[in-house]
Amino acid sequence: MMSTQHFILSLTILIIISNLHDEVNACRELGEECVTRGPKSCCEPLICGLKSHGTGVCVKCIPGGSECKKSEDCCSKRCKSGYCKFK
């Protein structure tokens, strides 16, 4: 039979593991730091507006003059030569 101390220790470990799992798999919200892919990517429909190589901040759209991959990610809806065009 499990003692009370063992039960509490087991429950504590389970809670810690559960919280770590949620943190690792949680998408990032508006204004939070992000990476372009993986567990720290932005929640849809937000996108990661890059600040440096592969990292940035979650935004609704990428402003003119910033790096882009697709026109739909730009506020102007125009991505040309890897940069969002100004409106």
Swiss-Prot record:
UniProt signal peptide: 1-26
Keyword field: Disulfide bond, Knottin, Secreted, Signal
GO cellular component: extracellular region
Main location: secreted
Disulfide partners: C61-C75, C68-C79, C74-C84
Domain notes from UniProt: The presence of a 'disulfide through disulfide knot' structurally defines this protein as a knottin.
Record protein name field: Uncharacterized protein SJCHGC06711
High-level lineage: Eukaryota, Metazoa, Spiralia, Lophotrochozoa, Platyhelminthes
